[in-house]
């Protein structure tokens, strides 16, 4: 396995709980914050392995030409169906404030794209909303409650995205594909 592929494999394997012999050490950066945040949250809430990472990738995935793969991005803001990736947390917060000043209310933020309109009490402030661990923890608690209420992780994934069955089903299929692809 070439060094580049070994680094990528090692990075994803560590996020999904696999041990890699002779793995190259990988320094985590902004592009790794969402995946890193999901690890302790998933363990604490006993969500299926790789599910939070796959949802984060589906919600905020962006392509990295150097890595040759997509990764979730913590400073993502989505409004009007358009996701925007910002270089810093401050830029993302500034964008949300500007959108709110324009009267836009339906805004998704952070690693797990929590909707600030439908989840108005999720965070005390925008700094918390964009904190990868806090954002992921809220999403995982919400997802776990959906699982308890629906009796199925598949339904929980669908409802996490939408109450619309058709849209939810498409979303679930995409998330499961990402989960299986990254773990396999």
Model-found features: residue ranges?
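Generic low-polarity alpha-helical segments
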Residues: 1, 17, 51-52
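Bacterial N-terminal signal peptides that target proteins for export
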Residues: 1-8
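General helical structural elements
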Residues: 9-10, 176
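Bacterial N-terminal signal peptides
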Residues: 10-17
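Sec/Tat signal peptide C-region and signal peptidase I cleavage site
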Residues: 19-23
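Catalytic glycan-binding domains that act on GlcNAc-containing polysaccharides
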Residues: 24-184
């Amino acid at each position: 396995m070439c060094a580049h592929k070994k680094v990528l494999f090692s990075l994803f394997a560590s996020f999904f709980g696999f041990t890699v012999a002779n793995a190259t050490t990988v320094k985590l950066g902004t592009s790794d914050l969402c995946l890193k945040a999901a690890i302790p949250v998933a363990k604490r809430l006993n969500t299926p392995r790789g599910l939070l990472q796959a949802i984060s990738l589906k919600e905020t995935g962006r392509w990295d030409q150097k890595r040759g793969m997509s990764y979730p991005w913590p400073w993502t803001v989505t409004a009007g169906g358009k996701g925007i990736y910002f270089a810093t947390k401050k830029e993302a917060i500034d964008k949300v404030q500007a959108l709110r000043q324009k009267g836009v209310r339906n805004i998704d933020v952070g690693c797990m794209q929590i909707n600030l309109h439908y989840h108005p009490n999720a965070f005390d402030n925008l700094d918390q909303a964009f904190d990868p661990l806090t954002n992921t923890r809220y999403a995982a608690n919400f997802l776990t409650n959906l699982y308890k209420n629906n009796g199925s992780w598949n339904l929980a994934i669908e409802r996490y995205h939408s109450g619309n069955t058709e849209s939810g089903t498409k979303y679930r299929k995409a998330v499961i594909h990402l989960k299986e692809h990254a773990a396999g």
